[in-house]
A protein has these predicted regions:
Chain A
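GT-A fold catalytic core of metal-dependent nucleotide-sugar glycosyltransferases
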Residues: 32, 36-111, 115-117, 122-132
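Aromatic-acidic/polar surface patches that form glycan- and anion
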Residues: 4, 8, 29-33, 112-116, ...
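Juxtamembrane luminal stem/stalk of type II transmembrane Golgi/ER carbohydrate-processing enzymes
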Residues: 1-7, 49, 68-69, 75-80, ...
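Short amphipathic alpha-helical segments and helix-helix/interface helices
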Residues: 9, 16, 40, 96-100, ...
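Hydrophobic/aromatic beta-strand patches that form the interior of the parallel beta-sheet core
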Residues: 20, 54-56, 110-111, 171-173, ...
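N-terminal anchoring/stem segment of glycosyltransferases
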Residues: 1-50
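Short loop/turn segments at strand-loop or loop-helix junctions that form parts
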Residues: 1, 20-24, 115, 126, ...
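Catalytic core and acceptor-binding pocket of nucleotide-sugar-dependent glycosyltransferases
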Residues: 38, 116-233
Length: 233, 466
């Protein structure tokens, strides 16, 4: 059983919402990771005044709490600077490329990609009608019953390529902005590993490690965070 | 001969006093009138009096009076034999008294004359007011006789007609998979003509889309899903229009006097309902009650605002019916049209989804909560009545079937290509529509011929009896 973390951001205050995957109506045969979609919807219901919803997998740590989502990512100018335009949405060879003329304040969905696909464990959604449309479409039972290999990640990649109204609100940003890797497993993601000062570190793939475990990998970073808070940083 | 033989007015003269130029007065040779003239002369010293004086002095007239021409010699004889008209003096222009003016010659002295005179006088006194009233009436007539009334209906500020686009799906199949015989052509002609007339009358745009089977898509069944693509293309083609009304080919507008604005859109809240529990043939659970959904998605009627209605459909006995539906231009509609067809859903379901887009929409309505707050339903008989044979053979379901006494707006001969006679049905409804919408003159003529016929029949019956 895993829990994912949802952070709602409103101005300078943020709250964290820990959904329980069993709360949501998912069939027994469907992987539980699909629960993150209704969980975001749930957070939007519970926090009706929050603008940004930052979904973060539990195997990730916010290393630099000084950075705020508004300034670091979602600010209009900053987002327009960060946006990676005109690249295949789903690497390596998708024919659908990100749009190049999107305005920062019209973006409702910010996500990163690594060399294999979209990074689906760390993304930001802005509240609105589009968010409801996107989440409900993503959660359509037909996608779940299709049995995508990688579950909702593949479903996300599918709908982002097939439906222009979703692509029109999507921005890709560099991976290290909010999903730096703790270790480059495949060897292709050079430059995406965590460096001091990065916002978030993601421990994706730590459960597949043969020699160590997730707790082991995360331990030093926890210590660093604790010492940081002790020194009042 | 007239005295004025010479052209110069000084000597010939005489025009100042018309009495002198007439040769009939005193044609005895004495040309000077001597005393009484018929019209008084203003000045005393005139040519005539001068001539008279000189004639007196001289003793003879100053010109020859003899043999002055045929008419002069024989005038009296001729004039006495000419037909005489009772042209009273008072009628001539010259007559000062004008005793006959303002009198009706034939009706003189009768009561009718008095009435007519009084009426005439009243009209004359009120001529300005009557002119204004007449002007207004003429303008009114002119408005309706000329294309002005159609321009009014079409303009976006007055009638609002340009905000509506009727999309007619014609050429179904296009004769590719099946032969398109004379019946099919006739049905298409009738249907198109009916929609064209309606659109012209109210100023709507009519877009006739070709639904022939084309190898445009990778999978052949995808070809019947063109409603969605067509709707998108039409929305792009008419950027000013707000509402798009999709009509299948086998439909007929029975009452062209109803405009869409008056029939449906001026009071959208009353004409549609949003809670599907009002009539739920598919038994879709409504409203949604998952706790993770926001209040609007959980409410049975969305946000209760008329502006948020973006899609109006109707339900027949088996579910949603997309033979006649309305779509509004909005971002929500764009997203709906985008997500409607998806290869994952299509691949899994196209064999089960007999009605293609209809079933896909039902599935989306069921499973995706963002759709429900913006979809409204209207009563089927408001713009999608069925004929007997569809959803019931006898045609007596008051919720579904066309009722003549209620003058339903549109008949959708759904499913007529399976087992029924499409041409017969559309012909029957066309005749019915023409009969119901006769103008008063035709009604009068029909009443006369009907009464003659019934009189004849009753007479024949009596003869048979006796």
């Amino acid at each position: 059983m895993w829990q994912s973390r949802r952070t709602g951001k409103n101005m300078r205050r943020s709250t964290t919402f820990f959904p329980n995957e069993n709360d949501y109506p998912i069939e027994k045969t469907t992987p539980k990771s699909w629960a993150r979609i209704p969980a975001i919807r749930h957070a939007m219901t519970l926090y009706p005044y929050t603008t940004y919803f930052f979904y973060l997998d539990y195997r990730a740590l916010i290393m630099n709490p000084e950075l705020s989502i508004e300034e670091h990512i979602m600010d209009t100018k900053r987002l327009e600077d960060l946006m990676i335009t005109d690249v295949p949405v789903v690497p390596p060879d998708s024919v659908i490329k990100t749009f190049s003329h999107l305005k920062g304040d019209r973006i409702d969905f910010v996500i990163t990609q690594d060399k294999e696909g979209l990074v689906h464990n760390s993304f930001i959604i802005r509240r609105g009608e589009w968010a409801k449309y996107f989440l409900d479409a993503w959660f359509d039972p037909l996608y779940r019953s299709y049995n995508f290999q990688k579950g909702e990640q593949h479903a996300l990649e599918h709908i982002v390529q097939w439906h222009g109204t979703i692509l029109a609100k999507l921005a890709l940003i560099p991976q290290r902005t909010m999903a730096s890797l703790y270790k480059d497993h495949s060897g292709k993601n050079v430059g995406a590993t965590y460096k001091e000062g990065d916002f978030v570190i993601s421990f994706e793939g730590c459960d597949k490690e043969k020699t160590s475990s997730c707790e082991h990998e995360m331990a030093p970073f926890f210590k660093a965070l604790e010492s940081q808070s002790e020194t009042g940083g | 001969m007239s005295l004025s033989r010479s052209p110069s007015p000084q000597r010939g003269g005489g025009w100042s006093s018309p009495g002198l130029t007439t040769p009939y007065n005193g044609s005895s040779g004495r040309s000077s009138p001597m005393g009484n003239h018929s019209n008084g002369i203003a000045n005393n010293i005139t040519w005539a009096s001068a001539q008279a004086r000189s004639a007196e002095i001289k003793g003879y007239p100053s010109f020859s009076t003899r043999n002055q021409g045929f008419f002069h010699r024989h005038l009296r004889k001729i004039s006495s034999s000419l037909p005489q008209f009772n042209h009273t003096d008072s009628r001539s222009y010259a007559e000062k008294e004008k005793l006959g003016r303002g009198r009706w010659p034939l009706l003189h002295g009768t009561k009718i004359e008095a009435i007519l005179t009084r009426v005439g006088r009243i009209i004359w006194r009120m001529r300005l007011r009557l002119a204004i009233v007449l002007g207004i009436i003429l303008l009114w007539i002119g408005f309706y006789v000329t294309p002005l009334h159609r321009m009014y209906r079409r303009s976006p500020w007055f009638g609002g007609g340009s905000k509506f686009v009727i999309i007619l799906a014609a050429n179904q199949g296009g004769g590719v998979m099946e032969w398109k015989g004379p019946r099919e052509w006739a049905i298409e002609r009738d249907s198109v003509r009916n929609k064209k007339k309606y659109a012209k009358k109210w100023g709507y745009d009519l877009e006739i889309v070709d639904m022939s089977t084309k190898k445009r898509y990778a999978h052949e069944w995808r070809e019947s899903w063109e409603k969605v693509d067509t709707l998108r293309i039409t929305m792009r083609k008419y950027p000013d229009a707000e509402w798009f009304w999709w009509l299948d080919l086998n439909t007929f507008i029975m009452e062209p006097s109803y405009s869409l604005q008056s029939h449906m859109f001026n009071n959208l809240a009353k004409n549609t309902y949003r809670d599907i529990n009002h009539y739920n043939p598919l038994h879709i659970p409504h409203p949604l009650n998952d706790t993770y959904l926001d209040l609007e998605s959980r409410s049975p009627t969305g946000d209760n605002k008329t502006e948020s209605i973006n899609f109006i459909i109707t339900q027949d006995c088996g579910g949603f019916n997309l033979g006649s539906f309305f779509a509004k231009r909005s971002t929500w509609t764009d997203r709906l049209l985008d997500i409607w067809w998806d290869p994952v859903g299509y691949e899994q379901k196209h064999m089960q989804w007999e009605h293609k887009e209809q079933d896909a929409l039902e599935s989306m309505y069921r499973n995706q909560p963002w759709i429900r707050p913006h979809v409204a339903f209207f009563e089927q008989r408001k713009a999608n009545s069925f004929p007997p044979g569809a959803c019931g053979d006898r045609g007596d379901d008051p919720k579904i079937h066309y009722q003549e006494k209620d003058r339903d707006f549109l008949v959708n001969m759904a499913g007529c290509e399976w087992g029924r006679d499409c041409w017969g049905e559309i012909y029957k409804y066309r005749q019915l529509s023409n009969r119901l919408n006769r103008n008063p003159w035709e009604k009068f003529k029909d009443w006369i011929s009907d009464s003659i016929r019934s009189a004849r029949q009753s007479r024949r019956k009596e003869e048979k009896k006796s």
